[in-house]
């Protein structure tokens, strides 16, 4: 429920009420309902006033793996989201201008879908409504945590909304406020960063032909190009595009008029879904790898982009964050049963030990994929050809790759 001012003390304070922070709060509240944990979510932006029935051609979207769907189902979020999600029934992986195409289908995997694409506004409204209605979660917005200082068995927090400040004690502070978390900087938590010298051009398009639940990962000379299926909008065959290009080319492409940019995109993607009939407003953001050197401290844990920001090439950022979130909920749940404070290091250390292999594999896989498919050197071109061919020739290898893509194979 929305509160006008926070109480003096909470078991858990979550900085950030976005997709990761809100989902964590809802999942934790459901899993530990009997424990009666006091949870506070602090969100800098006011709840959206967007009409839930209003549609937009340009709505941003997120790809959720099959494993993420299961996590959201356990949190009773999926029951509200399922009728707004577009299923991915087939993934087509190709290298522009070279032989070798790999296809992964839900039929091969005996599943109804490999994953789902949801519009951020739909998921955001569901999460916001759940936070607003929840009796076990205090939702303080718009507000920010201005200062965080360790104390014995917890944290002292200074939370501001407008000209008012509130002092709050918390056993555990969860930082889920994005890759530019000011509290991380204030606490001196350092991030290792790697610049890929690429920008992502993100937009929605309408194709001549229906996508039929197909998602495409196309590796081009400009960089990886992902095309994801979206729900139709006014009888338009919509897809979401994430096109990774080098920094210099991104400036060039964004200066083009819409017709010229559409031609460039059509040339890179080809005619798999016919011609592109409409191009939405493009947005651009820099791509890199960022990993926090400390994900836990006594009474502090990092989740989502504040812990690790990945390249979108494999679509694993949000999915990894949800698996981290699920593991943290389980560790806190076990700790409480053992009589531990939820911010104790043994609780947080157990979480990190359980998730470290998953994180390492996803980060390494994504980083290697970027380097392999963003290079036109002959050795890497041959490696790509062999890789795509091997996925088709060896069913066991394809099944293993599919499990990773569906978010059910990481971490052993």
Where do the language-model regions lie?
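Beta1/beta-strand and adjacent pyrophosphate-binding region of the FAD-binding site
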Residues: 4-20, 40
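N-terminal FAD cofactor-binding segment of flavoenzymes
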Residues: 54-96
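Short FAD-binding loop at a beta-strand-to-alpha-helix junction that anchors the flavin cofactor
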Residues: 294-312
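Glycine-rich FAD pyrophosphate-binding loop
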Residues: 29-57
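C-terminal helical "tail/cap" subdomain of flavin- and related membrane-associated enzymes
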Residues: 330-412
């Amino acid at each position: 429920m929305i509160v006008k001012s926070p109480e003096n003390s909470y078991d858990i304070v979550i900085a950030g009420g976005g997709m990761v922070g809100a989902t964590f709060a809802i999942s934790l509240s459901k899993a530990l309902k009997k424990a009666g944990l006091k949870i506070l979510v602090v969100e800098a932006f006011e709840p959206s006033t967007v009409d839930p029935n209003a549609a937009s051609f340009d709505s941003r979207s997120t790809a959720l793996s099959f494993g993420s769907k299961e996590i959201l189902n356990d949190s009773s979020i999926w029951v509200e989201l399922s009728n707004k999600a577009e299923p991915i029934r087939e993934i087509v992986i190709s290298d522009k201008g070279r032989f070798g195409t790999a296809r992964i289908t839900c039929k091969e995997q005996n599943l109804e879908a490999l994953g789902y694409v949801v519009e951020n506004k739909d998921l955001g409204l569901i999460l916001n409504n759940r936070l607003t209605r929840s009796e076990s979660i205090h939702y303080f917005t718009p507000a920010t945590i201005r200062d965080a200082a360790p104390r014995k068995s917890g944290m002292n927090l200074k939370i501001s909304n407008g000209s008012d400040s509130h002092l709050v004690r918390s056993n555990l502070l969860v930082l889920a406020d994005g890759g530019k978390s000011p509290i991380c900087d204030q606490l001196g938590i350092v991030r290792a960063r790697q610049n890929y010298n690429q920008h992502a051009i993100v937009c929605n398009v309408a194709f001549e032909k229906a996508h039929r639940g197909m998602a495409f990962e196309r590796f081009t000379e400009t960089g990886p190009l992902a095309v994801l299926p979206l729900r139709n909008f006014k009888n338009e065959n919509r897809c979401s595009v994430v096109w990774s290009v080098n920094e210099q080319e991104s400036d060039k492409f964004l200066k083009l008029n819409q017709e010229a940019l559409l031609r460039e995109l059509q040339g890179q993607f080809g005619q798999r879904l016919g011609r592109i009939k409409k191009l939405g407003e493009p947005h651009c953001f820099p791509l890199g790898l960022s990993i926090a050197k400390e994900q836990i401290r006594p009474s502090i844990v990092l989740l989502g982009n504040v812990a690790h920001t990945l390249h979108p090439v494999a679509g694993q950022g949000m999915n990894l964050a949800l698996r981290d979130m699920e593991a943290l909920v389980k560790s806190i749940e076990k700790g409480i049963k053992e009589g531990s404070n939820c911010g104790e290091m043994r609780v947080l250390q157990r979480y990190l030990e359980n998730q470290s292999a998953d994180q390492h594999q996803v980060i390494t896989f994504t980083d290697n994929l970027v380097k392999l498919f963003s290079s036109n050197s002959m050795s890497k071109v041959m490696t790509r050809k062999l890789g795509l061919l091997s996925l088709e020739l060896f069913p066991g290898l394809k099944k293993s790759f599919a499990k990773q893509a569906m978010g059910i194979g990481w971490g052993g």
